[in-house]
């Protein structure tokens, strides 16, 4: 997620230690920060270095030139209550209490999943995501800021973050992908969310999970546990046949022919004793690097 924005401010032509904002001139504040650090891995002694940093009420200065000042304004900047928030979440005894703990907004980013004995299930894409007054500059474009109307001042509301509550089918899931496919019966529309919210992406691990739980089977807890530990490699299901065909057509050398035989016997799982799984994974990583 895009949790910060880089803003471009105009330096005061009359004083390079001030910048122009909201029609007035504001001083840049300078702080000296001393950081201890260890040199090497065997010596326990510490050395320290003091740096002078420039900061503004909008955020720290990350770059400047003769005319411009660049600052980064980050959603999680200065937040220290993540541990307290997690403790409150663990102590919650209802969905309302749990969401009340989330309202602290101390966790920079997390995919969170909830279930309770009342039958509620929820997954929420959680983040300290700014509510931007302009289109996001992403990671490559600073946004010109001449006054307060140009910079973000609050986070996107908790209830406006991508989330799925009690969907048809009785499940939610997340494998650290975007939240748009938490349930195939309740897909989230990317267009509903600002452009600094994560885009929908469904990688192989999530696709595999949906194959396991997204059907019409009625699953017991034991069934869920068995499927949770599936060793299936979905990528192999999709490309192994073509790989084998290409190898056979290449007049393989003896070593390659032996590897081909291993792949042909392989059951497309990555169980601990699966030689084919290790071989296929090694090939795929090298293939990706070409």
Show the residue positions of the predicted features:
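Mature extracytoplasmic enzyme cores
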Residues: 1-256, 262-272
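Structured, charged N-terminal subsegments at the starts of enzyme catalytic cores
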Residues: 1, 269-290
């Amino acid at each position: 997620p895009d949790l910060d924005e880089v803003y471009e401010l105009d330096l005061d032509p009359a004083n390079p230690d001030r910048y122009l904002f909201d029609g007035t001139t504001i001083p840049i504040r300078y702080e000296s920060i001393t950081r201890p650090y260890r040199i090497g891995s065997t010596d326990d002694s510490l050395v320290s270095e003091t740096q002078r940093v420039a900061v503004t009420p909008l955020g720290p200065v990350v770059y400047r030139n003769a005319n411009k000042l660049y600052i980064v304004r980050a959603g999680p900047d200065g937040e220290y209550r993540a541990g307290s928030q997690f403790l409150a979440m663990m102590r919650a005894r209802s969905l309302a209490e749990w969401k009340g703990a989330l309202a602290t907004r101390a966790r920079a980013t997390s995919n969170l999943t909830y279930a309770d004995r009342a039958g509620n299930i929820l997954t929420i894409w959680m983040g300290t995501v700014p509510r931007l007054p302009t289109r996001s500059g992403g990671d490559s474009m600073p946004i010109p800021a001449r006054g307060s109307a140009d910079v973000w001042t609050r986070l996107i509301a908790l209830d406006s973050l991508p989330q799925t509550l009690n969907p048809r089918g009785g499940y939610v899931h997340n494998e650290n992908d975007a939240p748009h496919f938490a349930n195939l019966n309740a897909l989230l529309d990317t267009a509903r969310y600002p452009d600094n919210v994560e885009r929908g992406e469904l990688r192989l691990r999530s696709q595999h999970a949906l194959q396991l739980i997204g059907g019409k089977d009625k699953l017991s807890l034991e069934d869920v546990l068995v499927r949770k530990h599936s060793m299936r490699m979905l990528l192999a299901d999709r490309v192994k046949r073509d790989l084998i065909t290409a190898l056979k057509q290449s007049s393989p050398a003896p070593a390659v022919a032996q590897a081909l035989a291993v792949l042909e016997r392989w059951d497309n799982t990555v169980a601990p004793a699966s030689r084919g799984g290790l071989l296929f994974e090694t090939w795929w990583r090298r293939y990706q690097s070409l």
